[in-house]
């Protein structure tokens, strides 16, 4: 009986440090998790400075929850306080897919939002394609592959640009004049397009190439609520963040599908000289202002530009890190 207090004291002496050690270990795990938010969030923050991306770790889902908060209407340079109202949504990070929790069971259908886009530079001549490259183009153009392959998640862009339904996006459209042509676009890309226009018109003063190109444009297409052929998903024209340049003379190849109808399986080998393309000076200006050009896709669409500043920022950050 006299030994019981002594034994109890010994137990406390040995058990207490173990408990504290375990507690410290748990705290370290929490701390590590808090410090390990997805690094790609910095890309989104830089691409969309008026939008906040807040990460909270979910033990239940074992994944990050990303709360996105953006203005209800565009905040412009001329009117920086245009809107103090904001809207919020929370996505699961899901390895960069940014999808609602309800879509987790279908996550294999989606690719990450951030995908490689070859910012800057010029196109490779088709005459130098390897057999592997030609096969890659051929596979990309197969209807079966295009319909069944996973695609980049659009839940973020649908939220930011009200693209989840035709009714919602049509409440945020504007008819503007761009490079002398009327076009309907999402109100959130009016200012980026204005920056593009200002730079192109300035370059036009000393560039006969740009002047000739602009004089050859018949009209432009912007908003069009429709699906992409063969894949049954909404085009970004449906979100109104894309525009197409349509020339007066349609005497060159400008879209892979139309080219395939003429050249068959050798559509990807159409020479650059035989393709209708904007001058690189114009392409570079668009890219520097956050737009990507469809002419750099495997299934190329040379008339097409769309506002994707996150892809431009993704290229800059990943390629800077590699240097």
Question: Across the structure, where does each feature detected by a protein language model lie?
Answer:
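Boundary at the C-terminal end of the N-terminal hydrophobic targeting segment
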Residues: 19-23
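Acidic, glycine-rich low-complexity/disordered segments
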Residues: 209-228
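A generic secondary-structure signal for well-formed alpha-helical elements
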Residues: 14, 200-208, 289-290, 309
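N-terminal accessory beta-strand-rich subdomains and adjacent acidic, glycine-rich linkers
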Residues: 32-165
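Bacterial N-terminal signal peptides that target proteins for export
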Residues: 1-7
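Bacterial N-terminal signal peptides
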Residues: 8-17
